[in-house]
Amino acid sequence: MARERIPITREGLEALRQEYEYLVKHRRPEIARVIQEAREHGDIRENAAYDAAKHDQAFIEGRIREIEELLKRVELIEQPTDGDRSVVRVGSTVTIEIDGEIETYTIVGAIEAKPSAGRISNESPVGRALLGHRAGEIVPIETPNGTLMARIIEVQ
C-alpha cells in the first residue's frame, strides 16, 4: 500500500531540508565527538556525560530518519500560475470572520502547522472546512465545542 503524500509549502520544504542538513553536518558529528570524549574518561557504565550523549544521539538519529521519511513523501504545493488564487487551498492565506472577530490563517500541511503563528493544518477543523471555498462564502466549521459559521473575507 502506497503511503499518503504529505502536502508542504516551498517554505516548509526549505525549512525541513535546512534542519536535516544541520542535524547531519553539525549535530551528528558533535554528538559523536562528545561520546568519544566521554569514553576516554574511563568506565562508561557510570558516566553521566556518556549516557546523556547517547540519549542525545538516539534523539538526533531518530529525527534524521523521520525527516528522511518525510522528504520521500512530501508533495510540494505551488500556488496556481493561471491567476486563480480565489479558491482556498493548501498554501493560501485566508482572512475569516467568526462571531465578529477577524483572523488570518495560512493553510499548510500538517507537518508545518503552528497555530500560534497563524499556520493551521489542512487537516484541522478550520483548515478542512475552508478548503475549496472562496471569498464571500459562509462556511460551517465543526469543532469539538459545536459548529461555528465563518465568513471568508479574503483569499490570497
UniProtKB/Swiss-Prot annotation:
Stored InterPro entries: GreA/GreB_C_sf, TF_GreA/GreB_CS, Tscrpt_elong_fac_GreA, Tscrpt_elong_fac_GreA/B, Tscrpt_elong_fac_GreA/B_C, Tscrpt_elong_fac_GreA/B_fam, Tscrpt_elong_fac_GreA/B_N, Tscrpt_elong_fac_GreA/B_N_sf
Pfam family, one: GreA_GreB_N
Listed GO biological process terms: DNA-templated transcription elongation; regulation of DNA-templated transcription elongation
Keywords: DNA-binding, Transcription, Transcription regulation
Gene3D superfamilies linked to this entry: Transcription elongation factor, GreA/GreB, C-terminal domain, Transcription elongation factor, GreA/GreB, N-terminal domain
Record has Cell membrane as a keyword: no
Molecular function terms, GO-annotated: DNA binding; RNA polymerase binding
Function: Necessary for efficient RNA polymerase transcription elongation past template-encoded arresting sites. The arresting sites in DNA have the property of trapping a certain fraction of elongating RNA polymerases that pass through, resulting in locked ternary complexes. Cleavage of the nascent transcript by cleavage factors such as GreA or GreB allows the resumption of elongation from the new 3'terminus. GreA releases sequences of 2 to 3 nucleotides.
Family statement: Belongs to the GreA/GreB family.
HAMAP family linked to this entry: GreA_GreB (MF_00105)
Protein name per the record: Transcription elongation factor GreA
Organism: Thermomicrobium roseum (strain ATCC 27502 / DSM 5159 / P-2)
